């Protein structure tokens, strides 16, 4: 095994190669500073998914079946009805609101009271007369109280909901029919806040500046969500006013910044956010593109760095419905974990950085068309075989998270890089710059879509090693705090929108996931989004997610004195303690 001395040796080698810590370096003269253009890499064009293949629909249908089998009813309180009202006369002078309420109450069994929203009242007179007093109403019927949210002259006006996963790096949404659950559109885009920092800490610092709260809120609400929802509604052929419920799953900081709430307490000891759960908000309160009275549901947070994206994801994983111990891992800019079973659950978060989603990687990108999502390298020729997101014949544009896992694992397996992530073999696919920094060429300029070389450098590899080390050290700390180890795990669920799937063997090979039976691993995709979908559709799912959040114990890693030692030890391939990865020794 390797000790911490290797870490200091590595730092000495970096210094000898010309690397310096910018925070402790004073320039003696004019210098040129190169800053990675992280923002432009993630503010790429919005992608609206083609649902005609049925792949996305199949995923969400399977979710519905699984959670229903666990006792969750996919029903909600939304109702619609077509009403033919008596037209007013000089002898029948009942006002429009009372006339509509009377006919609406008769249309539903058990309805004891009718309420109209302000939005409905404003448009009521014109709509009734243009429709000759035959209209469709849309609203909710809860405990006998009918709340009419909209009145339409169209007798078949649709009833839609929207589910959104707001990630630190990427935002993804789906549009659904609230009655049937059918998906009609999906879209994703980079989080507009990325230009203010790649991680939540930098964004919290930015929002603390003059006008910062408004800037950060506008970046996610106006620059990201508004066009995202508009694109989905256009794809589905409906106006945004037909969206009557919105569920958003995001981390604690993203929730605060979306609502324009000061997030600074999240990063200050004792790390207490303004809220964990906030209900009763409507689209008009937030300025969200939907029916003005549409309910905005936020999946509940459970800690300063474990938010609604994880409560929604833990719900989707169904670890709460199992007797055996399971581990749920969400690979994102903030790596979050949940461990437990039906009796208890514990959660924690670690700052993995944006590498899992292609950030801080020279040729990194989100998992959209042109992303290299899988890599295989021939040990003798060192030539790569690439799997690329997109239609047949798609040329590579960059590399996404799953592809980065593969290429680093393959470089290590073929002995092209050492356990420190440095290049130790030469070949036509390995090149070095004027400073001696090595890189592996995945695609030459002629082979790529952009006409630029696609490669992974030693700096990229180092960034990713730190990201995987954050995940593995968090797993170790969480389990050891319970006097357990990885041998107790019966299931390991991996989530995150980093590609169409993860090669679990390679994830173990680089030391990101524990070296246990590979059959125990399952990739679930974007569970934050699928959990938000369930909450948007099902009142029972909302109650269950709230219950999970209230019963989940939060573990603050930043105050654990052992975490940094565990992290440093994991900053090698696969780890300084090779005995933790017996399969890599056999290789």
Q: What is each model feature region?
A:
Residues 3-8:
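Short, small-residue-biased leader/transition segments that mark boundaries at the very start
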Residues 9-163, 168, 180, 217-218, ...:
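Nucleotide/phosphate-binding catalytic cleft detector across ATP-hydrolyzing
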Residues 164-168, 173-201, 265-278, 312, ...:
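Glycine-rich phosphate-binding loop of actin/hexokinase-like ATP-binding domains
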Residues 192-235, 360, 371-376, 463-466, ...:
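N-terminal phosphate-binding loop and adjacent alpha-helix
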Residues 225-244, 475-489:
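Phosphate/pyrophosphate-binding loops at sites that engage ATP/ADP/AMP, CoA/4′-phosphopantetheine
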Residues 251-265, 436, 484-487, 496-515, ...:
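Short glycine/threonine-rich loop-to-helix capping motif typified by GTGT followed
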Residues 341-343, 484-548:
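Catalytic phosphate/nucleotide-handling subdomain of diverse soluble enzymes
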Residues 412-482:
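A contiguous, well-structured pocket-lining segment that forms one wall/lid of small-molecule binding clefts
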């Amino acid at each position: 095994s390797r000790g911490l001395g290797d870490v200091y040796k590595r730092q000495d080698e970096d210094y000898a190669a010309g690397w310096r810590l910018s925070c402790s370096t004073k320039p003696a003269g004019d210098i040129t500073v190169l800053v990675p253009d992280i923002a432009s890499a993630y503010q790429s064009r919005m992608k609206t998914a083609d649902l005609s293949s049925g792949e996305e629909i199949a995923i969400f249908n399977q979710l519905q079946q699984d959670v229903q089998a666990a006792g969750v009813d996919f029903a909600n309180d939304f109702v619609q009805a077509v009403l033919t009202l008596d037209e007013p006369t000089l002898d029948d002078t009942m006002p429009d609101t009372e006339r509509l309420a009377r006919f609406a109450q008769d249309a539903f069994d058990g309805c004891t009271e009718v309420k109209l929203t302000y939005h409905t009242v404003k448009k009521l007179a014109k709509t009734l007369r243009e429709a000759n007093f035959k209209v469709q109403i849309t609203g909710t019927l809860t405990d006998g109280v009918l709340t009419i949210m909209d009145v339409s002259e169209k007798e078949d006006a649709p009833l839609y909901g929207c589910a959104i996963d707001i990630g630190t790096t990427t935002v993804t949404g789906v549009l659904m029919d609230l009655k049937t659950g059918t998906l009609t559109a999906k879209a994703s885009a980079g989080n507009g806040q990325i230009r203010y920092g790649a991680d939540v800490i930098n964004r919290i610092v930015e929002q603390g500046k003059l006008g910062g709260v408004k800037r950060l809120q506008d970046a996610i609400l106006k620059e990201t969500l508004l066009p995202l929802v508009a694109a989905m509604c256009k794809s589905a052929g409906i106006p945004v006013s037909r969206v009557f419920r919105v569920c958003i799953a995001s981390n604690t900081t993203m929730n605060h910044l979306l609502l324009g709430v000061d997030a600074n307490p999240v990063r200050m000891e004792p790390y207490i956010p303004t809220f964990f759960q906030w209900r009763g908000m409507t689209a008009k309160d937030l300025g969200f593109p939907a029916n003005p009275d549409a309910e905005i549901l936020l999946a509940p947070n459970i800690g300063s760095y474990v938010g609604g994206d994880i409560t929604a994801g833990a719900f989707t994983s169904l670890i709460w419905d199992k007797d055996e111990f399971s581990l749920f891992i969400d690979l994102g800019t903030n790596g979050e974990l949940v461990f437990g079973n039906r009796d208890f659950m514990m959660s924690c978060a670690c700052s993995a950085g944006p590498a899992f989603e292609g950030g801080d990687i020279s040729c990194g990108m989100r998992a959209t068309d042109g992303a290299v999502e899988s890599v295989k390298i021939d040990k003798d020729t060192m030539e790569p075989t690439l799997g690329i997101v997109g239609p047949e014949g798609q040329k590579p544009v960059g590399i996404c998270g799953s592809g980065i896992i593969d290429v680093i694992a393959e470089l290590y397996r073929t002995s092209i890089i050492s356990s420190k992530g440095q290049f130790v073999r030469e070949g036509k696919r390995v090149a070095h710059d004027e400073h001696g920094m090595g890189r592996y060429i995945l695609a030459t300029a002629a082979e790529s879509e952009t006409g630029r070389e696609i490669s992974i450098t030693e700096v990229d590899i180092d960034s990713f090693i730190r990201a995987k080390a954050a995940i593995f050290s968090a797993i170790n700390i969480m389990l050891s705090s319970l006097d357990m180890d990885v041998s107790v795990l019966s299931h390991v669920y991996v989530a995150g929108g980093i590609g169409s799937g993860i090669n679990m063997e390679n994830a173990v090979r680089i030391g990101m996931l524990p070296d246990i039976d590979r059959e125990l691993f399952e990739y679930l995709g974007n569970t934050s989004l699928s959990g938000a979908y369930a909450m948007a559709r099902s009142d029972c799912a909302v109650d269950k997610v709230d219950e999970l959040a209230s019963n989940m114990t939060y573990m603050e890693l930043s105050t654990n004195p052992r975490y940094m030692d565990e992290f440093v030890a994991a900053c090698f391939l696969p780890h300084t303690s090779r005995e933790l990865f017996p399969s890599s020794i056999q290789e």
